[in-house]
A protein has these predicted regions:
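Catalytic core of membrane glycerolipid acyltransferases/transacylases, capturing the structured
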Residues: 41-65
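Divalent-metal-activated hydrolytic enzyme cores
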Residues: 1-31, 64-80, 84-92, 103-181
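Conserved H-X4-D acyltransferase segment
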Residues: 28-46
Length: 181
């Protein structure tokens, strides 16, 4: 089905926007904002904000997380995307786009509280990634249902990601120079 959709793409908007796509191809990308979004197939940042091609530099990962700054550690994909957006593309804004019903956050919640049947091996890439949630999980209240705690974790994970973002020196420098919000 992917090949079929690809073959019909030129007829579904490409032809009427050919000059814009030509401009993007020749001039390169100059996005105004970076969006760090969940890789959940239901979350489409360009559709949510009505963005055009070339407007956003988008990085997607499980649960829209930003790891702590750690040049000698793991998670270089997200860190490299942030560095590229800030230092090479000079984006003016970074948005962490959290969402409700996030399967990654739900999985992270059950992994953090060691819910039977939801555990991951220490060698799991998913577990290592979702360990970024630990500081947000540790702040959850003791009272409430699992569903309420997961909804709170969805919000707190964005806060932790923004705090982690502020630990990147090039992000701090761009903010201090009024080039980034």
């Amino acid at each position: 089905y992917l090949v079929k959709r690809y073959m019909t793409w030129p007829k579904s908007g490409f032809e009427e926007n050919r000059s814009w796509f030509q401009h993007l191809a020749e001039m390169g990308q100059h996005p105004r904002a970076m969006v760090i979004s969940c890789c959940d197939s239901r979350v489409q940042a360009t559709a949510i904000f009505g963005a055009e091609s070339g407007e956003f530099f988008i990085h997607r990962n499980i649960a829209n997380l930003i790891p702590p700054f750690n040049p000698s550690g793991d998670h270089h994909g997200t860190s490299a995307a942030i560095e590229y957006a800030v230092t090479a593309l000079k984006v003016a804004h970074i948005l962490v786009l959290g969402h409700s019903g996030c399967g990654g956050i739900q999985h992270g919640y059950h992994t953090c509280n060691q819910t039977p049947g939801h555990g991951l091996e220490d060698t799991s890439f998913i577990k290592k990634w979702l360990d970024i949630l630990n500081p947000a999980y540790d702040l959850l209240p003791d009272e409430g249902t699992d569903e309420e705690k997961i909804a709170t974790l969805e919000k707190r994970s964005v806060v932790v990601s923004l705090q982690n973002l502020m630990g990147f020196p090039f992000v701090q420098e761009a903010i201090e120079a009024d080039r980034l919000t």
